[in-house]
Amino acid sequence: MFRARPVRVVMAATPLRGWQVDPATIRYVGEGLERPECILAEPDGTLWSADGRGGVVRIAPDGRQELILQSTVARNENSSFEDRYVNTMGSLPNGLAFDADGNFLIANFGTDSLELMTRDGRTRTLVDSIEGKPVGKANFVTRDSAGRLWLTVTTRMIPWTRHVETMSHDGYIAVIDERGVRIVADGLCGTNELRFDPAERFLYVAETTKRRVSRFEVLPGGALGPRETYGPENIGGFCDGIAFDAHGNLWSTLIMADRLVAVTPEGELLTLLDDGRPEATAALDAAWREERVTPDIMAQATGTIAPWMASLTFGGPDLKTVYLGSLRGSRIPWFRSPVAGLPLIYWNERRRAAA
């Protein structure tokens, strides 16, 4: 196990040790959502959810919601499980981030591109090829304090589930800045969400299919140092979403096992919520160990709170409300945490914009 150098903001023993989410306290927001994989929370209580119909859903603090479709795509509805989750047909907004003006950066798992969408749906493609090759399965995007964009690509395999079956190491991280777009880390296995520590000294990424979190030192000019494992070599499931809290704990959703865990700064793995089906999860784990995972085995493993639990977002005025994103859910579960989340770069930008 890698013993991480501290990323704590608050120098104190983690309140997460000995704490778990009480399922009876979980509440829900939104209804009729499609593939709410990623959620953005604003300081005023507004939520934005990626939506598999090809856009985002705005959920106002009073619960009213509005679907905003991308101007460049046809409405993506009524598709089969195989078309939506295996063949990823149509627009499938996956990872979301705000740009400096409050518009949406979209890593689109369906169109295999990085897109920019305004709040009224006008959309343009920012990146659809890198070094003369198609991007592949664009998964997540984030922004740093220098204005650079960081994009993860899970795999270049079509359909993407072939990557899970073969555990191919063809995922990568790309950076976009004034010099253009370039790959800064490759040979990764199921590259998914990525986050910075508070000082932006290290970049952390979920390697979903490898079932580990990796990190890279951020070097001058946007280069990355060598990969190193953060926390357990096997985090216990397919880590998908990751987010830091203010105590330096790195939370992660384990999709299909539908488990929420956290890695402490000391490298200890804590289970915060377990909503999976034990037998189906065990079958999936065995298939992963034997490199025989199939879409059918994956489909059987799921929970009920946030089916195919894919991400987590800290929100609320004190950043102690946790929202869970999912691939197969139609609403957003939320609960209260004993610790606040680490504010993302856009948090204070949106607070100033609302003032």
Language-model features: locations:
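Blade/loop signatures of beta-propeller domains
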Residues: 2-25, 162-170
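Beta-strand-rich domains and repeat architectures in extracellular enzymes and scaffolds
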Residues: 25-56, 330-331
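Beta-rich, blade/repeat-based domains predominating
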Residues: 30-44, 74-104, 131-157, 167-173, ...
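Beta-propeller domains
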Residues: 48-73
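Residue-level marker for isolated small/hydroxyl-bearing positions within beta-strands
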Residues: 50, 107, 152, 206, ...
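A short loop-to-beta-strand structural motif that recurs across blades of beta-propeller domains
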Residues: 55-57, 113-115, 171-174, 212-214, ...
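Short, solvent-exposed loop/turn segments at conserved positions within beta-propeller repeat blades
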Residues: 109-110, 158-170, 208-211, 255-256, ...
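Short loop/turn segments immediately following beta-strands, especially the blade-tip
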Residues: 216-223, 265-270, 275-277, 336-345
